[in-house]
Structures are given as structure tokens and as C-alpha cells.
Amino acid sequence: MATAIRFALALAWRLSQADRDMKITDVLRAEHAVFHNLFDHIETAVPKLKTMAEVKVLAAAVEKVHAPHSKTEDDLFIEPLEPYFDQMGQQETFHDEHEQIEAALNAVQKARTLKEAKKILLNAITASRQHFDKEERIVFPMAERILKAKTLSELGEQWLCRRQVGK
């Protein structure tokens, strides 16, 4: 957790520097660091939870922060890379994975038993971790090789505008 906090502080400092460009890959890695800390907490907390309401609140919290992250990735990041994903036969993979994670988080709200809700939530967390790992190992490095630094920075600026960070 301390590593993620240091990373988030470093990100905040970089965002405060008007003369520095923030690449979209830097932004997404920072968001992933925060998610991993949230996931660590959920994986520890869920087995101890005693009510459906507790599980549902955690799932809703993850969904609330995951949805804009997924939309940002799809709109600003995956879209410019789609021709390359198409060549690899992976054009729909990342969109589909985002939708599957969102569907799993929504399914927690419809679970009929505490055991089922816990299982669905933990499976959604596992799927998210696997998805993030694929992005961090394959997609982000590929983007940094394929896209120009200026493009990555412009996409980072678009993220700032969407999130209204620093305004």
C-alpha cells in the first residue's frame, strides 16, 4: 500500500507541473496502482463479511470507480490501437473484458445468497487483476512503442480534461 501511495503522490506532483507532459500510459498505470490497493483490501475483507449489504456496497464501490476507468481506456487508449489489435486478432478482447468485469460487478447486486455474492465479487476482482496484468505487460509497452510520445501526452491531456484534474 505504501508503494501505491508514493506512486499516487508522485503522480499528483507530476500533474501539478504545468510544463511537464503526462502520458496516458502513466495515468492508467497510476489508476491501476490504486485499484490494486482496493483489490487487496476487498480480498482481505470479503471472507470476513457477514451480510449481503456489505458485499454489495463493496461491489458498487468498485463498479463506481471501474466504469470511468474502463470508458477512458476504451475511448482514449484502446481506440487508437484498434488497428494493431485487429492484426493480432484481439480487436474485441479488451472491450469484452471490460464489459465482463462490469457485468460481474452488477451481478453481485442480484446474488441471492451471501456465499454467491462473495464468490461473484472475488471472481470479478480476479478478472480485473488478470486484465490489468495483460494491459501492463502487453498493451502499455506496445502503445509506447507504436504511438508517438506526443500522441501519448495528448491522450494524457484528454484524460485530465475528462477528469477535470488540476482545474
Describe each PLM feature range:
Residues 4-167:
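Small-residue-biased structural context
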